[in-house]
UniProtKB/Swiss-Prot annotation:
Pfam families cross-referenced by the UniProt entry: Thymidylat_synt
Catalytic residues in the record: C160 (nucleophile)
Residues bound to (6R)-5,10-methylene-5,6,7,8-tetrahydrofolate: D183, S282
Entry's family note: Belongs to the thymidylate synthase family. Bacterial-type ThyA subfamily.
Position of the signal peptide: none
Keyword field: Cytoplasm, Methyltransferase, Nucleotide biosynthesis, Transferase
Organism in which the protein naturally occurs: Histophilus somni (strain 2336) (Haemophilus somnus)
Name of the protein described by the UniProt record: Thymidylate synthase
Ligand binding (dUMP): R22, R180, S181, C182, D183, N191, H221, I222, Y223
Reactions catalysed according to its record: dUMP + (6R)-5,10-methylene-5,6,7,8-tetrahydrofolate = 7,8-dihydrofolate + dTMP
Function as written in the Swiss-Prot or TrEMBL entry: Catalyzes the reductive methylation of 2'-deoxyuridine-5'-monophosphate (dUMP) to 2'-deoxythymidine-5'-monophosphate (dTMP) while utilizing 5,10-methylenetetrahydrofolate (mTHF) as the methyl donor and reductant in the reaction, yielding dihydrofolate (DHF) as a by-product. This enzymatic reaction provides an intracellular de novo source of dTMP, an essential precursor for DNA biosynthesis.
Gene Ontology CC terms: cytosol
């Protein structure tokens, strides 16, 4: 995927070294990156210049759609992505609101499905969007946001990819996703799969055609212990053609996504890739 490699090269060539207090590492950083995914023509943005794993990314976002707040529920879907943040983040372990093992608090999907109002009632942002789009309504506010400044301290992690805005032009559905921070060698592969799949699913359950998905990243970075692998290995490889994503056509409603859908309902067709690269992960 050439636009991904172009961003990596831009960071290598133009990035500024920034100290990251949370991880104790330096990051080579650029501000503002824009990526576009062709969902209409099913050009699935799975990185081909190293072996990439897509199921955990879709499983995680399915957990957000369901409003999960417990790492055990994510494991049942097929992803362990929340194990460390729920159980090994010392600040969260010391937080008195934490309910115990695997509790994530009010993060991501909790905000998307149960945003709290001052009177104690909750707002289901996703349901409102699905209802409107199914009726052909775009009120220019079809926005799903996971970023709630008033409840940051009630969860184990601030959202990185935090807001998703849907737009209708005729019967074609578009998505613009916003991300405050991105570990490009590791996280971006995960996030671009989620952006693509979210639009594909929402188009399918609302009866619309999928258009383009736009992904805006504010702070795009490569950690210092990832730098040489990116510069000397991954950027030396030629990408293969992008694969396709097949989604079970029996998925027709939000209730389907909430109840019976599993990773068996997704298939990637025609994926070719280079050998795996083991990038260090920063917690």
């Amino acid at each position: 995927m050439r636009q991904y490699l172009n961003l990596c090269q831009r960071i290598i060539d133009q990035g500024h070294w920034v100290e990251n207090e949370r991880t104790g590492k330096r990051c080579l950083t650029v501000i503002n990156a824009d990526l576009t995914y062709d969902v209409a023509n099913n050009q699935f943005p799975l990185i081909t210049t190293r072996k990439s794993y897509w199921k955990a990314a879709i499983a995680e976002f399915l957990g957000y759609i369901r409003g999960y707040d417990n790492a055990a529920d994510f494991r049942k879907l097929g992803t362990k992505t929340w194990d460390a943040n729920a159980n090994e983040n010392q600040a969260w372990l010391n937080n008195p609101v934490r309910k115990g093992t695997d509790d994530m608090g009010r993060v991501y999907g909790v905000q998307g499905r149960r945003w709290r109002k001052p009177n104690g009632e909750t707002v289901d942002q996703l349901r409102k969007i699905v209802n409107n789009l199914s009726k052909g309504i775009d009120d220019r506010g079809e926005i799903l946001t996971f970023f709630n400044p008033g409840e940051i301290d009630l969860g184990c992690l601030r959202p990185c990819m935090h807001t998703h805005t849907f737009s209708l032009l005729g019967d074609t559905l578009y998505l613009t996703s916003y991300q405050r921070s991105c570990d490009v060698p590791l996280g971006l592969n995960f996030n671009q799969i989620q952006v693509f799949t979210f639009l594909a699913l929402m188009a399918q359950i609302t009866g619309k055609k999928a258009g383009q998905a736009y992904h805006k990243i504010i702070n795009a970075h490569i950690y210092e212990d990832q730098f040489e692998l990116m510069r000397d290995v991954q950027l030396k490889r030629e990408p293969f053609p992008l694969p396709r994503l097949e989604i079970n056509p029996d998925i027709k409603t939000l209730e389907d996504l909430e109840t019976w859908v599993t990773m068996d309902d997704f298939k990637v067709i025609g994926y070719q890739c280079h050998e795996a690269i083991k990038y260090p992960f920063s917690v």
